Amino acid sequence: GIFPKIIGKGIKTGIVNGIKSLVKGVGMKVFKAGLNNIGNTGCNEDEC
């Protein structure tokens, strides 16, 4: 019927959006960490 299709679509969209936002969140964290490293003499703590 129509309703299972809508529900299935909603779940798929939800999962896709969840993954996208997760990737974005991780990407931003990595990006910010990279900027922080550049700000802090441009090396990781282990390498300094």
Curated annotation (Swiss-Prot):
It is found in: Secreted. Disulfide bonds join C43-C48. The keyword Lipoprotein does not apply. Expressed by the skin glands. This is Palustrin-3a. Keywords: Amphibian defense peptide, Antibiotic, Antimicrobial, Disulfide bond, Secreted. Belongs to the frog skin active peptide (FSAP) family. Brevinin subfamily.
